[in-house]
Amino acid sequence: MRDRGFTLVELLVAMGIVTILATVAVPSYRHAMHRAQRLDARLALQRIQYLQERHYAQYLRYAARLGDNRDSPDSLAMPDRSEAGSYELSLLAGEDGQTFTATAQARVGSRQIDDLSCRQLAIDDAGLQRSADAAGNWSSADPQRCWG
């Protein structure tokens, strides 16, 4: 007559299978989460681009900074954080106000700080989309890697 329960070997085999599945699933889950959170940055940057074009139509120059003053020729009425709070937003305008670059950088303390391949996203007045990895290496060669 056989005792009810599991043998030690059966438990070790089951634990091994669970471990193998976890080593595959956890990185895939993190990658999917990082990719989903990038949408927060992309939407914020596209909103900045839209607001900059409206600002340019009104003042014939791009805004130089983000802020709360809606009627200032130097400020764009938008907060310096993305909606979900995962990214810090910044705006750099050319001295003549005819160019700009908007950047979203993963905020320290957010999950996105662990996004090693796409830690920063940027868009400029011409619509050029760029991204930077954790080391700060910028690239526009394959924008779909981080923007897609």
What are the roles of these predicted feature ranges?
Residues 1-29:
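N-terminal single-pass transmembrane signal-anchor helix
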Residues 9-19, 38-47, 133:
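Short, charged low-complexity linear motifs
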Residues 57-148:
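Periplasmic/extracellular, small/polar-rich flexible segments of pilin-like filament-forming proteins
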Residues 3, 35-39, 43, 95, ...:
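Residues at secondary-structure transition points
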Residues 14, 32, 107:
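Detector for the N-terminal beta1/A-loop initiation region of ABC nucleotide-binding domains
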Residues 33-61:
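Membrane-proximal N-terminal amphipathic helix
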Residues 18-20, 45-46, 52, 77, ...:
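Alpha-helical interaction segments
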